[in-house]
Amino acid sequence: MNESGQVRVVVTGHDADGKSVVAADKSVPPEATAAAGTRFHLLWGADQPPSYPDTGAESTDLVPFPAVGGIRFAESVILPDAEVDYEAESIAGLQLQPGAAPGMHTTPSVDLGVVIEGEVCMLLSGGVEVHLRPGDCFVQNGTLHGWRNHTDRPARFVVMLVGTEHRGLG
């Protein structure tokens, strides 16, 4: 991530002769519609399984959470608790859970993630907190969850989201 909070993404593709080329080299700003205390960078995505060879071109109308079978590659930065107003919910594309702790939500996806910087707590049903450190991986199977950072430094994780059917389980 650079000083402006943007993430550089290099995407490859194929030219007309089938040779590998740089299809995109871009800086991605955080999404404006992330959860309170979260900077969400949608780095890359597809709404259907990729087929090769392709140009590496990306759809310009991607939403943060994929449809069934779609994929997203993203980075999340979780700010320290002291910097966050968890009551100021602004989560787009998520199913918030009434009566649960602020920010608790489900997504119609399997989220495969790895913490790359800092420490973060994954909140689950019943107040369960799972402490994650750099190198720790998680698989979020469409379950009710939220994120907290009890330290004084931002935490970062990268995540691959795979769109799934979700029948409303909390």
What residue ranges belong to the model's regions?
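Conserved short histidine dyad/triad with adjacent acidic residue
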Residues: 27-28, 59, 72-107, 141-144
